[in-house]
């Protein structure tokens, strides 16, 4: 080795030692398999916003997005392990899955119950109790229906007995009300905003957040964030990254609502302006908080207990359903 080369090598070694060794490799991105619905609902909106803005990559995550055409297939993907997360889902849906042996845990909140509404065009119907003797289009298998039924019972109203309930998905409930086949429809955002825009006679007679707060003191959660236990064990540090990524989506939506609306219109095919209007209404709220916080855990667990007390579900899940670091 020449003196010049030796001097150069010596200098590089000295520099490396002074800087604590060779440069560390960039932190590897963790692959997370994400179930995404092909419907214009909250789940694909979050997925598309995160991907479009590169938010997953900024948090050392790599979303492997897998599309599903129905809610049943969507939940089945995380139940079977085909996906690590559905991004969002109903607390009592995960309660049922956990009690049936699915290794699912709730790591964060994301959407309060304010996105659940009942709409009517009838001037005679002013509140939920006014539906006595009337017809309601609703998805009776949904968590949202459970929430309405629990509140109704507290008001002395039994759905299915005092109110004739017509089984309908949220999209079909919209159609049934428009055709005049029912007196009211139970829907969620963004369908609610689209309905209110298309018919000036529609009025909101029930809001899930307002009703649940009246009943429990908390707004409750329509959607929470799940992760499979095997994913958590495989990449424990990814839990905090996933929550942080979702919080960045929340911040982006709040600070760049017009850009977010344009992305949603292009990718999820919502009419332009609907996403923005739903957010502005205060009904559609993105609120990502770690599920293990005392207030959040208590609110989620209260929903579990009420589902069992109302006999919608047979039993409570084990404590581990709510993740804690």
List each language-model region with its residue ranges:
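Pocket-lining segment of extracytoplasmic ligand-binding domains
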Residues: 92, 166, 171-266
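Secondary-structure end/capping motifs
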Residues: 232-312
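Bacterial N-terminal signal peptides
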Residues: 9-19
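Short, glycine-/small- and polar/acidic-enriched structural segments
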Residues: 27-159, 164-169, 183-189, 204-208
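Short, solvent-exposed loop/beta-turn-alpha elements that line the ligand-binding surface or hinge
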Residues: 58, 209-218, 285-295
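Sec/Tat signal peptide C-region and signal peptidase I cleavage site
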Residues: 21-26
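Bacterial N-terminal signal peptides that target proteins for export
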Residues: 1-10
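Solvent-exposed, polar/charged alpha-helical surfaces in well-ordered, non-transmembrane soluble domains
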Residues: 48, 53-54, 76, 80, ...
